[in-house]
Amino acid sequence: MKILISNDDGYLAPGLIALADAMAAIADIVVVAPDSNRSGSSNSLTLDRPLSVYQAANGFYFINGTPSDCVHIALTGIMSEPPDLIVSGINQGQNMGDDTLYSGTVAAATEGFLFGIPAIAFSQVNKGWGQIDAAARVARDIVERRFDTYGKPFLLNVNIPNLPYEQMKSPVATRLGKRHQSEAVIKAQDPHGRDIYWIGPCGGQKDAGEGTDFHATALGHVSITPLQIDLTHTAQLEALKKVLV
């Protein structure tokens, strides 16, 4: 098996290194990641300038672009054959509910899915790398599960509690929860007295009921959510057709 690995925290991130080590124990790996932290870059591609590919001493490729750039270039310019699986992460911090729309970690997996390749995004709840080895062990457990009877290609979003491996509960299938709207921007001034703005913190949990990713991880379970790309609001199609008559 060959696995392509990427992330949005950058090629030096402990989460990427731990994930690569875990995957290297069970497969041939290729790592292509951003040269720096690209959190919140979503599915953006860099179209206004050329991109450069570099290789670190450990064999990881890194690119001065977004997570989607990295996977796109890996599949169309670096790898001679497509991988069997793409994994992204392990992100420092959860990607649950509305987070998935902004997440570069999820976007890297999504880019592979758009190429018809099964993909899994891995994130660890809360900040800090103290339990990253446990999270990497969970990631390996999930990749080693047999998905032969599962529809391919698939796109999975996995959130792992920030706990020792022995304290984690079994993986559960979940749906995305929902957050309240983001908090207000933080306004300040630069040294020249000009107004500057920092994007405010994400909103708190709005829908964290049973069956959601928020609920599962709060109870210590590993949350696995199947994602799709089709943004069509199917339930409103017929109503829209009537408006347009």
Curated annotation (Swiss-Prot):
UniProt key word Nucleotide-binding: yes
Subcellular localization, as worded in the UniProt entry: Cytoplasm
Gene Ontology annotations for the cellular component aspect, listed alphabetically: cytoplasm
Amino-acid positions noted as binding a divalent metal cation in the UniProt annotation, renumbered to this chain: D8, D9, S39, N91
UniProt cofactor note: Binds 1 divalent metal cation per subunit.
Entry-linked SUPFAM superfamilies: SurE-like
Keywords, ordered alphabetically: Cytoplasm, Hydrolase, Metal-binding, Nucleotide-binding
Catalysed conversion reaction: a ribonucleoside 5'-phosphate + H2O = a ribonucleoside + phosphate
Principal subcellular localization: cytoplasm
MF annotations from Gene Ontology: 3'-nucleotidase activity; 5'-nucleotidase activity; exopolyphosphatase activity; metal ion binding; nucleotide binding
EC number: 3.1.3.5
InterPro entries: SurE, SurE-like_Pase/nucleotidase, SurE-like_sf
Source taxon at top rank: Bacteria
Gene3D superfamilies for this protein: Survival protein SurE-like phosphatase/nucleotidase
Cofactor needs: a divalent metal cation
Family to which the UniProt record says this protein belongs: Belongs to the SurE nucleotidase family.
Function field: Nucleotidase that shows phosphatase activity on nucleoside 5'-monophosphates.
PANTHER family: 5'-NUCLEOTIDASE SURE, 5'_3'-NUCLEOTIDASE SURE
Protein name stated in the entry: 5'-nucleotidase SurE
Taxonomic lineage of the native organism: Bacteria, Pseudomonadati, Pseudomonadota, Betaproteobacteria, Burkholderiales
Gene for this chain: surE
